[in-house]
Amino acid sequence: MKTVILLLVLALTVAIIIPTINGESVATAISDSEAEPLAESFAEPLALLSKDQALKHVWGVLKKLGKAAMEYVIQQICAKYNKK
């Protein structure tokens, strides 16, 4: 479990410290097919939710964004070292 947490922290650190890899922004890691559902999920009127529900909703969206960014960073690192 500690290893998984360390790997996640490392991936997030790389995504934050190195905003681009091979000239491509990490922000572009989220494809259009992933971005559209995320945008729709934010369209839900958060004002009608309780504070706890709104926080859970926003946290869920942030987790999806973080996962996509981490997957992209890992793919780029693997691609870089598999080119040999």
Curated annotation (Swiss-Prot):
GO terms for cellular component: extracellular region. Keywords: Antimicrobial, Disulfide bond, Secreted, Signal. Residues 1-23 form the signal peptide. Expressed by the venom gland. Its main location: secreted. Transmembrane segments: none annotated. It is found in: Secreted. Residues 24-47 form a propeptide. Belongs to the formicidae venom precursor-01 superfamily. Causes cytolysis of mouse DRG neurons, proved by a drop in calcium concentration in all cells and a corresponding increase in fluorescence of the extracellular medium after toxin addition. May be one of the major contributors to the pain associated with envenomation. May have antimicrobial properties, like most ant linear peptides. Homodimer; disulfide-linked. This is U-myrmeciitoxin(01)-Mg2a. It comes from Myrmecia gulosa.
